[in-house]
């Protein structure tokens, strides 16, 4: 015998719940990877994407990095060169052209680099930031052109060049054209060195692969954010190759600092002050009594290196 339907519990109540269901944004809360603590998204964003309490440094967009660094959060975007899209007509599980389209829609950026010119602590500065959200910040032709354009801007305006590195390495979908960017960016760094302009690298989580093997490890000073993974091949690949367990914290910023590969591990909140001080010293900027930098003593121009 089939029992009569209970209209109150089976029909009316679900409809009432649906009618008055509160819309809750999916990203309202962020879970700390270290402690499991749940923190309001807005609170983390206002704290420059550092979890209050645990001080865990989350990934940060390129635009947010520039806003954090430049005085009053304002800067001039450096126009980046256009490059041929999908020159190899590459396809794996999906077409490379489709991957680019998805990444651009997701990030609102043409590729994985954003470069700005402005003032940091009163000093003119050129800053390049990699966007990990764009195909893991991988280095392709567009990225190589962007890095070189940033270096050229620093040379033209006689400013320090600061890089925030965040990348999974070379972009495999561009093959040899991607690998060619490693020597090209190295030449750009040599031009900065020949002109006696500081090149400071901030290694963020993660910085790996061909980016680590080229411009990310050619700085005059290497800073790193706490806990950042910095390597060529990741620890899992190395363990599978040598069949041995690696030390705790291997290839993390603190481990590399202890072994001389990183000059200093700097909390994100202290990066602007630290970089301003370093650039002031390297550019021979003298502080006025009010604490503001006076006009830097610029080095004499040096012809571009071949």
Swiss-Prot record:
GO terms for molecular function: acetyl-CoA carboxylase activity; ATP binding; carboxyl- or carbamoyltransferase activity. Residues 287-306 are annotated as: Disordered. Belongs to the AccD/PCCB family. It catalyses: N(6)-carboxybiotinyl-L-lysyl-[protein] + acetyl-CoA = N(6)-biotinyl-L-lysyl-[protein] + malonyl-CoA. It comes from Methylorubrum populi (strain ATCC BAA-705 / NCIMB 13946 / BJ001). It is found in: Cytoplasm. This is Acetyl-coenzyme A carboxylase carboxyl transferase subunit beta. The keyword Signal does not apply. Component of the acetyl coenzyme A carboxylase (ACC) complex. Biotin carboxylase (BC) catalyzes the carboxylation of biotin on its carrier protein (BCCP) and then the CO(2) group is transferred by the transcarboxylase to acetyl-CoA to form malonyl-CoA. It is an enzyme of class 2 (transferase). Its EC number is 2.1.3.15. Its main location: cytoplasm. PANTHER family: ACETYL-COENZYME A CARBOXYLASE CARBOXYL TRANSFERASE SUBUNIT BETA, CHLOROPLASTIC. It comes from the Bacteria. GO terms for cellular component: acetate CoA-transferase complex. PROSITE patterns: COA_CT_NTER (PS50980).
């Amino acid at each position: 015998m089939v029992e009569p339907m209970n209209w109150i519990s089976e029909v009316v109540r679900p409809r009432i719940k649906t009618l008055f269901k509160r819309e809750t944004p999916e990203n309202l809360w962020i879970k700390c990877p270290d402690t499991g603590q749940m923190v309001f998204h807005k609170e983390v964003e206002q704290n420059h994407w550092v979890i209050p309490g645990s001080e865990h440094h989350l990934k940060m967009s390129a635009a947010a990095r520039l806003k954090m660094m430049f005085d009053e959060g304002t800067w001039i975007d450096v126009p980046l060169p256009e490059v041929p899209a999908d020159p190899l007509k590459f396809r794996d599980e999906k077409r490379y052209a489709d991957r680019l389209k998805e990444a651009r829609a997701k990030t609102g950026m043409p590729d994985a680099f954003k470069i700005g010119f402005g003032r940091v602590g009163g000093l003119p500065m050129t800053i390049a930031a990699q966007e990990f959200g764009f195909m893991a910040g991988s280095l392709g032709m567009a990225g190589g052109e962007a890095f070189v354009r940033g270096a050229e801007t620093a040379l033209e305006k006689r400013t320090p060049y600061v890089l925030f590195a965040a990348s999974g390495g070379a972009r495999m979908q561009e093959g040899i054209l991607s690998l060619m960017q490693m020597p090209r960016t190295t030449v750009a760094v040599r031009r900065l060195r020949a002109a006696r302009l500081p090149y400071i690298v901030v290694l963020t989580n993660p910085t790996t692969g061909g980016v680590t093997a080229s411009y990310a490890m050619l700085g005059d000073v290497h800073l790193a954010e706490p806990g950042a993974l910095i390597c060529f091949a990741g620890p899992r690949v190395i363990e599978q190759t040598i069949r041995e367990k690696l030390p705790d914290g291997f290839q993390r910023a603190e481990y590399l600092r202890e072994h001389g590969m990183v000059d200093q591990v700097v909390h994100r909140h202290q990066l602007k002050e630290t970089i301003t001080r370093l650039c002031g010293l390297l550019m021979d900027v003298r502080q006025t009594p009010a604490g503001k930098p006076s006009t830097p003593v610029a080095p004499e121009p040096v012809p571009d290196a071949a």
